[in-house]
């Protein structure tokens, strides 16, 4: 018997059943327990959501930016008031430790919504004189109805990252959460309605890609798609969106990010950063610094520091506040990670720790993989080239700065990069040469609301967060005004 009642679709400010009557199970990855049966949206449900969104968007866009901001700020207050309950639901659905979801997932999502509620009023056009009797002005107008497809690792945070700029700019959004972790997106829809968002302005359609995801990207009345997920799926989404109606797209995709530890680095600081860049959220973070480059002479000292820190990881029940490392999100994903680990062993990487599924006691019921560190890695190894999206750190050695940068850039990805050094001149020199959209110096992982985030190369298109993203949810209208009598040549 599932823990929760059937989860319906959220269309037009209320819960409705899927028209096709199909459902899918959502599982707690720490225990294998079925949490709920969730209704699977289809094309007919999408059409209903689009109709609802179009009606709601007209009402929403007619409000002043001040009025829209007040409603969004009420939603922020409700999110913060319900932080603990939402965090617990997120932990049940994702397997992430409660210590994480309480302090990061809802908190940072609410921060982004608050940011856009504040800057929405700064979305202004320009007035430019052309000559004595003529000028033009520009308007930033909402796109209309936009679609978004979320990932399973940060469900409510990603939903808010996508909804906040879209709604602040006057759009309506149809959001498809990952079918693996859809529960908190539905709660977010409730909160928006309670805060005063007009019906239809934020609809949630759980379901798989075949049943609703493709239909969302192809729908002719959806003006933009924002997608977070893997690069292979991103290519399909982009092709579908462009071939159907030339939709605009924003994509935050995969990564295989480098972390360069410089010869003058504080090795304790570098080890702390490497641990967070690989094992936070059990390694299920797109920006993870999974390729750690360390000077050859410092390899053994650095290995020792990493191994000492692995011993401090508290693996266990995600609902236990002492736990700092939980299961992977699903059995299928666990199997994929384990296959990559076996590939690393077969290709000659030296296993320092981990490398297996954890099955002691209650852990056997969940999808736990031990924190894994490989050393003696080479650039051609599969574990170094491919995104694993799990707790697998690959340690590589280098001899000089130019070599480190060249090898760090030798990837089709370009999402993130980091440098550890006390020398700021060196830090800037290296960062400016690294081909990545998000870079950190002597830190890792923070993405505050005002900071645009997104990738180079095959790690993404466009940006999330920051003022530029608000503008990306608008289209610019240019209007010329002639004050003198128009002179025709005919």
UniProtKB/Swiss-Prot annotation:
Cofactor note from UniProt? Binds 2 potassium ions per subunit.
Residues bound to K(+) 1 are: 93, 180
Cite the active-site annotation. 162, 252, 286, 464
Annotated residues for binding of K(+) 2: 246, 457, 460
Instruction: Name the chemical reaction catalysed here.
Output: betaine aldehyde + NAD(+) + H2O = glycine betaine + NADH + 2 H(+)
Where Cysteine sulfenic acid (-SOH) occurs, the residues are 286
Q: Which GO terms describe its molecular function?
A: betaine-aldehyde dehydrogenase (NAD+) activity; metal ion binding
Q: Which of UniProt's keywords are assigned here?
A: Metal-binding, NAD, NADP, Oxidation, Oxidoreductase, Potassium
Question: Which leading EC class covers this enzyme?
Answer: oxidoreductase
Q: In which pathway does it act?
A: Amine and polyamine biosynthesis; betaine biosynthesis via choline pathway; betaine from betaine aldehyde: step 1/1
What's its job? Involved in the biosynthesis of the osmoprotectant glycine betaine. Catalyzes the irreversible oxidation of betaine aldehyde to the corresponding acid.
**HAMAP family reported for this sequence:** BADH (MF_00804)
Please report which protein family the annotation says this sequence is part of: Belongs to the aldehyde dehydrogenase family.
Q: What is this protein called?
A: Betaine aldehyde dehydrogenase
Origin organism of this chain? Answer: Xanthomonas euvesicatoria pv. vesicatoria (strain 85-10)
Biological classification of the source:
Bacteria, Pseudomonadati, Pseudomonadota, Gammaproteobacteria, Lysobacterales
Q: Which gene encodes it?
A: betB
